[in-house]
Amino acid sequence: MTEATGIVGEFLTLKEGTDADLLAMQCGDFYEFFAEDAEIVADELDLKVSQKSSHGSSYPMAGVPVDDLTPYVSALVERGYRVAIADQHETENGHAREITRVVTPGTHLETGDESAQYLAAVVREASRDSGDTYGIAATDVTTGQFQVTQLDDADAGEALTELYTFGPAEILPGPELRNDDEFLDRLRERTDAALTLHDSASFEPGRASHTVREQFGSETVDSVGIGDQNVAVRAAGAVLSYVEDTGVGTLAAVTRLQAYGERDHVDLDATTQRNLELTETMQGDSSGSLFDTIDHTVTAAGGRLLQQWLQRPRRNRAELQRRQSCVAALSEAAMARERIRETLSDAYDLERLAARATSGSADARDLRAVQETLALLGQVADAVTETERLAESPLADALDGADREAADSLAAELDSALVADPPGTVRQGGLFKRGHDDDLDEIIDEHEAALEWLETLPDREKERTGITHLSVDRNKTDGYYIQVGKSETDAVPEKYQHIKTLKNSKRYTTPELDEKERDVLRLEERRHDMEYEHFQRLRARVAEHATLLQDVGRTLAELDAFASLAVHAVENDWARPAVVDGNELSIEAGRHPVVEQTTEFVPNDLYMDDDRQFLIVTGPNMSGKSTYMRQAALITLLAQVGSFVPARSATVGLVDGIFTRVGALDELAQGRSTFMVEMQELSNILHSATEESLVILDEVGRGTATFDGISIAWAATEYIVNSIQSKTLFATHYHELTALGEELPTVENVHVAVDGEPRSAGSDGDVTFLRTVRDGPTDRSYGVHVADLAGVPEPVVDRSQAVLDRLRDDKAIEIRGSEQNDGGTTQAVFDLDSGQFRDGAAQSGGAAAGSTAEPVATDGDPEHAPGEAAAEGPKGDERAASLDSETEAVLSELTELDVNETPPVELMAKVQEWQAELDDE
Ligand code: ADP
Ligand code: MG
């Protein structure tokens, strides 16, 4: 068949011209996939493959009916494919087909998912002096949101964090990032986004700037301050051009350019978001996350907003107080709150409806949903004004954010146009009420009259003919007909013309019926066309109001989010925290917001300020150290969301960032060594945290040998205390670190108290702990203590203690303070053996020195450290005398080997080699 050749050929040509993964090409009433595409689609979607022959070869073919395309495409896109759609249209000489739309993960309008769906672009430029500048733009085509930011002098980590926070479905890397494998790898580690190489030209500054100004207007671009942010503009331009190219048709709904800077938000890196389990648990479940726990929103948009708040806590005190006041008012006005939530639960997703109206995919039911939701604004506004507690709160202002008059008038317009319960298809009439348009009314009247005539025809005919089994119906082949039961066919009047005989009946028509049929068909077609035209006009009216819809949608979403926070606060007895400037963090009877849901939680206090900047948290395993620290981080975070917090009372000094290093179990799965990851994260914290940050370190150093670990933990503590000065909580099982708490002025020890007489939890003999946090360090040998409590035999416990003492033998560490604070570098020297301080530069020498054996090394006098000398062992020449030449050789190789420069595998090989050499003797 030559026609077949044509179709497959055309398919392959179109496919060549697109970089989409799959092509669906319209062929009459079907969309067809051919060749390889057919096989992929059939596999993914369980479609049947048939064969299409062309040029003597045969091609696999799979198709879906035109009306069913959307769900199939959605399913493919959700599996990560980019699907091009070629529509067919009539031309003078037959059909022509062209690609009208490419549906991609980031431009997928018919998503079944309520959460935000971001398409992001990221670009990088090397800046003159130091570091790089990253520009990121992200849009959600389903809601018209558009956000841009520029990160100056940033390392890739900050850009990756931004992208992680958006969780985009699709990312367009700029031309300069496409070959940066390291960046791309790290990107893939953090997101599941599809990476798409969009036309490089659209990233060019001139072109991008033009695109952005066209979209938002030059004034807007300048007023939000991205006009001179070249890098941000490049990302924004690329995103807009991609949305345009894919043909999703929602650009008109993208009306608001939101530019945000680094100073607006609390810095939360990807690790911290994961560690604090903000939106999903470490295991990757959304249930059990902070969001899942506190989310009581009743609308999809409200849920999206609340989630966004959690991921982007704020630093602006006025904004936080505004939010708190709204939550406070709603938590007190219980009746009004429930009335508002009840009302909101009828709301549809206005932001998404705006995008559907703009893209031309909204049907009459969607416009009805718009109308019904717009009408809710008035209802909730009434609930606010009628309730004194709410009326005097900032909620009243929040509601003014949306133009109520415009909303009412659009709602009224839609209400007077559309019938109450319109059909799901827009091409078959029945959409409009009478009175919408005179000409339309006339056609509707005529049409209905004709239908009425047909409807009453059976009764008239029965009466006239006396036939009882008579009906009038319609089908595709016969048109309208009169059907008479077999037993009564003898009685039919003469003018009945027989058209068909069935088993139990005969069908007839009459000249009159034929004429009415022609009328009805003509009127029907006319009516459908007219209604469709009017509908398109009405939909365009709604699209013109996209901004209004978004405003109202966001106002309702905000109200929903506030009400949700209020519900959670009331139900869980949370308190409104004081948000203040400065470094205070005080929490009275604080709880962990997620753990308190499932456990009888033992509340704890926390106090930190300038003089108590760094807390070392000690206590046995499973005593609650990690929980206590996360609780501090989550309470700070919630306070900076504007929420109430799980505590009797709290004062939270606003932070610029929260950094955590908690647990390591999940990282093993990624094939990176736990310790490497631990150190990378520590490194990131030490680079990024400032004196306004909150840092949570949980068991840092645990991933390596004990003394290695202590050393790193020790040095990191000194560095944070002396150089960074962030508010820090450090849980450690290295009891040695508590020495720092006793010596450095801003470092304090707290411990989770272990009950002397352990309470037995039930009959299984589990040891339970008190979990109360108190000042001071924990019992130094709690590990052994726990072994004892758990009933390990006495000889083992005793021996453990002895071994521990031996291990700590003869070790001493000096403690460093900062120059300006302490007038000297060395603060004290801690003897790990005795658990006592020896001498130190800043210590008042005499008494302390007298109580211990000898003075040990300080910074000022490193050469003559007696400890070191002792550790060196026998002097060189003595050693030479007692060693054979092989051993000498091994030793000298060992001395020369640069451990840091030698790959671990080589190191192992070396060690084996040496062992073999030494064995030979
Ligand atoms: P650690 O870090 O000291 O090993 P965790 O913080 O992991 O201990 O806590 C151990 C267990 O105790 C967890 O199951 C946690 O839910 C529970 N827990 C911790 N703190 C409390 C508390 N204050 N009240 C009740 N249960 C707690
Ligand atoms: Mg822990």
From Swiss-Prot:
Superkingdom: Archaea
CDD domains: ABC_MutS1
Gene Ontology MF annotations: ATP binding; ATP-dependent DNA damage sensor activity; damaged DNA binding; mismatched DNA binding
Binding residue positions for ATP: G619, P620, N621, M622, S623, G624, K625, S626
GO biological process: mismatch repair
Family indicated by similarity: Belongs to the DNA mismatch repair MutS family.
HAMAP family assigned: MutS (MF_00096)
Functional description taken from the UniProt entry: This protein is involved in the repair of mismatches in DNA. It is possible that it carries out the mismatch recognition step. This protein has a weak ATPase activity.
Protein name according to UniProt: DNA mismatch repair protein MutS 1
Organism listed in the record: Haloarcula marismortui (strain ATCC 43049 / DSM 3752 / JCM 8966 / VKM B-1809)
